[in-house]
Amino acid sequence: MFWGLIMEPNKRYTQVVEKPFHISQAAMDISTGDNDPCQVMVVVDGKNFLVCTLQKGKIIQVPLDLYFKSGDSVSFLTNGKCNVHLTGYLDPEFEEDLEDEEEAEEEEEEEEAPPLVPAKNKRKLENANDATANKKAKPDKKAGKNSAPAAESDSDDDDEDQLQKFLDGEDIDTDENDESFKMNTSAEGDDSDEEDDDEDEEDEEDDDEDDEEEEEAPKKKKKQPAAEQDSTLDTSKESVDMSKLSKSQKRRLKKKLQQQAKQQPQVNGVDKPKKEEPQQKAEKKKPEAKKEEAPVEKKEKKQIAGGVSIEDLKVGSGPVAKAGKVVMVYYEGRLKQNNKMFDNCVKGPGFKFRLGSKEVISGWDVGIAGMKVGGKRKIVCPPAMAYGAKGSPPVIPPNSTLVFEVDLKNVK
């Protein structure tokens, strides 16, 4: 919001700031006064501060960046002969605070007003509270609505009582009322209108499905085990006249039958394979175990020159390592006597050397020869093909047999 002040010569303008404001510019009115300079002063805490000096033909306006907050006591004055215009704007944050306060006041007023519950939802809440008390009275009401003949037999009355008990056994009313209660407490007034429309559509769909339900209900009921049929109501056409049921009773009967159909055990032998699953898994594991054992049986230990023993843990498929070729390997070396690891290289480009050039121990020159890239070999080197009687103190003791696992990474 715009803020402005026109200052006349030699007049003091004093105020206690109510709304914070910002001064952005001071401009001289060149139609007033003479050519003498005009000084703009501001008084804060009893002290005079020069803001700017204006003069016709030289400086007639100056940009400013002055901010005054609520509660500040401030005065403005000029000592020249020209009118000076101070312009700026009110603090927008202050305006937002005012709007927030107004909104808060409006919200408080709305909260004080009693909430209005739609008549339809109010009826549902009352039904939820009185569900237990009305269970005994429901058969009479349903009979009145359906205009049952006065000369009905006692068996028909018993069937209606059993049907009512069957429908009331699941406490469907309570679930529906609880759901509507949650929706009413969390939704706005507009949402309640949408709910009414949805419920009307559901009622229309239920009316269309009523004829199908009369045929489906007996079929679903026949699938129940004998024990459950004894303890619940037989809803076949022979014992229940579906035409006497109200819409709400038909809906509740449909839900009841659907839930019982989900809970009943399968009779077509579907459950039996579940019990046999562990046996099937065990049978599947046996061939897999044989497959894993197969390569182990094929592993053969070979003894080559110098008493070196080799065993291919994995046969590669790449180029073959031959004498004179540069090979790159990952390896891990252990002492045979205690299985203590004394050296390894399992990261980076690997260990590189020329095979057969005596750059490594003799056991490696003969043990790695013949490997293919991608293969892994276990090499057992006797002392004579390793570090001999001297060993390599302090890591390798004298006369030590060494065991290496070597991965061939590349051959050049």
Curated annotation (Swiss-Prot):
Reaction catalysed by this enzyme: [protein]-peptidylproline (omega=180) = [protein]-peptidylproline (omega=0)
Note the superkingdom of the native organism: Eukaryota
Keyword vocabulary terms for this entry: DNA-binding, Isomerase, Nucleus, Phosphoprotein, Rotamase
Indicate whether Phosphoprotein appears among the record's keywords: yes
Molecular function (GO) terms for this protein are:
DNA binding; peptidyl-prolyl cis-trans isomerase activity
Q: What's the PTM story here?
A: Phosphorylated by a nuclear kinase in the presence of Mg(2+) and ATP.
Pfam family name, one:
FKBP_C
* Annotated EC: 5.2.1.8
Start and end of every PPIase FKBP-type domain?
Answer: 324-412
Q: Where is the composition biased (Basic residues)?
A: 247-257
Gene3D superfamilies cross-referenced by the UniProt entry? 3.10.50.40, Nucleoplasmin core domain
Please give the function described in this protein's UniProt entry.
PPIases accelerate the folding of proteins. It catalyzes the cis-trans isomerization of proline imidic peptide bonds in oligopeptides. Binds double-stranded DNA in vitro.
Q: Which family does it belong to?
A: Belongs to the FKBP-type PPIase family.
Name it: 46 kDa FK506-binding nuclear protein
Q: Which organism is it from?
A: Spodoptera frugiperda (Fall armyworm)
